[in-house]
């Protein structure tokens, strides 16, 4: 029994916990830019600042500087470079504070209401003796405001990006260009839960954690363009060779029972090291691209292209994927017999396209390699073997591919003040890269293995309508309307039509279907035996 609860209920003095763990957020952005040029050189320099105060008592602050220069050396040569440097600090605050704030009863006090502690936070609103003088109480949950005060989760980020290019044009119709784009990214996250936090209530005093990540990547593109007009005909041909590589290093450390409340800066003094880790990964990819664009009088348009990508994530026999595409378009408004509609019909174009795209982003760089765990030792006579394979590998992994057919219509009226598009598409994805559940008896402690497991079909409709309502020197008012409808359906799993219930995948259903049992009433023992004997009856999923 709590006399305080009686008073709160009689006076309708309820605590608005969601209001206490949230606030009004705001954001500010500032950018200063300086540009200039001479006869053959142009340059630009910019400085930016961003500051956000989040609704959940989180915050984000970012500084960045940009600089670029382009130079025409002579009639054949040109070169340029750009750089973007930034640093940011993200303060995530206490996740437990927000979650528990929305769970707390409005009958619980956030602050002492009188006495010498009036105005101070109540550490445990569900157990405090001032509220429950006879003992007991509904919960030992920590006051979310106290949790927030003693919790920190900060991430500092440093990022540097550059782009350097050299261009050579031996004749007017040919452009040769090579571009190097390196990028360096460093992240350091520090987490600290001191006294009077949820972590401490879970037996972890002065919990500190650091996570570090360094990543360096570069893309090197070399391309050749050929552009030529032959009367009413225009040809634009492109050939490109691209190299991409990324190296990432990471480390982590978790400690508890630090003697000082100094965030994560004195982890060497901690009594317990709960976890330590480090890691390295490398990803490489080579790409070839060929593309041909053709148009006749800007009326009939044709594009044919193909790219070949080789990824280090796959074994040599499955490393390369070929992804062709083609598209045709007809600008009906460019036909001579449409000249009478020019005053009200600005654009009318039909489009038809086909293309194949590839995806390898779902898997890590070493999913085709057998991984070992060093926690266990095996004695083979006089030889002690350290480690065992703990994750099953799949050497047959290959690219996930999506084949898409698209039919579209673009339209514009009244000098394109009203314009939009309609698209109908079908996307068939096959060799999906997904994890499959496996019995532990197969030798995997993870209970899963990556595979190219099935086929999924997406069909949909997309509509877009844009209008320019007012356009003047001092005022512009535009509106946009977008509608999209997509239907997703699993066609095949693991080469057949068998459901994979362990993963929640069912033939004919969406890949992320929400499913459950449909109650059909009480089943007697006799009915259960009859149903079990009839193998043709299956459980229905909705």
Spans of model-derived segments:
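Residues embedded in well-ordered regular secondary structure
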Residues: 1-56, 94-97, 112-153, 166-169, ...
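Extracellular/periplasmic, surface-exposed regions of secreted and cell-surface proteins
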Residues: 28, 61-63, 67-77, 82-87, ...
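Intrinsically disordered, low-complexity segments enriched in polar/charged residues with Gly/Pro
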Residues: 19-21, 198, 279, 383-384
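Acidic, Ser/Thr-rich peripheral helices and adjacent loops at domain boundaries
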Residues: 99-103
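Core alpha/beta catalytic barrel or barrel-like domain that forms the active/cofactor pocket
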Residues: 92, 109, 196-199, 303
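Flexible, solvent-exposed loop segments that connect beta-strands
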Residues: 9-10, 199-203
